[in-house]
Amino acid sequence: MTRSLKKNPFVANHLLRKINKLNTKAEKDIIITWSRASTIIPTMIGHTIAIHNGKEHLPIYITDRMVGHKLGEFSPTLNFRGHAKNDNRSRR
């Protein structure tokens, strides 16, 4: 179920403060965040945000096509390494 249009998109306050601060200075530093639930808004375009995936922070460059999505969508948490090989030698 999607979020109601009557409500504003969720963006963590600390993340919003950091982005507004960088926009006023016109700087492009990497912003480190653990807030995967924050929605990408147009003021974030052009910034690089390092999103936590449970183990490390993955730097993601925000483009205009990402607006409206959540930050966590671009930082995968699981690493699928494939199914186990059929090892007949260990069965004997």
Swiss-Prot record:
Q: Name one GO biological process term.
A: ribosomal small subunit assembly
* Location within or outside the cell: Plastid, Chloroplast
Matching Gene3D superfamilies: 30s Ribosomal Protein S19, Chain A
| A GO CC term attached to the entry | mitochondrial small ribosomal subunit
Indicate where this protein is primarily found: plastid
Q: Per the record's keyword annotation, is Ribosomal protein included, yes or no?
A: yes
InterPro entries from the entry? Ribosomal_uS19, Ribosomal_uS19_bac-type, Ribosomal_uS19_CS, Ribosomal_uS19_SF
Matching PROSITE patterns, A to Z?
RIBOSOMAL_S19
- Bilayer-crossing residues are none
One of the entry's Gene Ontology molecular-function terms is:
rRNA binding
**Does the keyword Glycoprotein feature in the UniProt annotation?**
no
Keywords, A to Z, come to: Chloroplast, Plastid, Ribonucleoprotein, Ribosomal protein, RNA-binding, rRNA-binding
Q: What NCBIfam families would the database entry show?
A: rpsS_bact
Q: Which family does it belong to?
A: Belongs to the universal ribosomal protein uS19 family.
The UniProt function text for this chain reads: Protein S19 forms a complex with S13 that binds strongly to the 16S ribosomal RNA.
Give the protein name, as stated in the record. Answer: Small ribosomal subunit protein uS19c
Origin organism is: Glycine max
Encoded by which gene? rps19
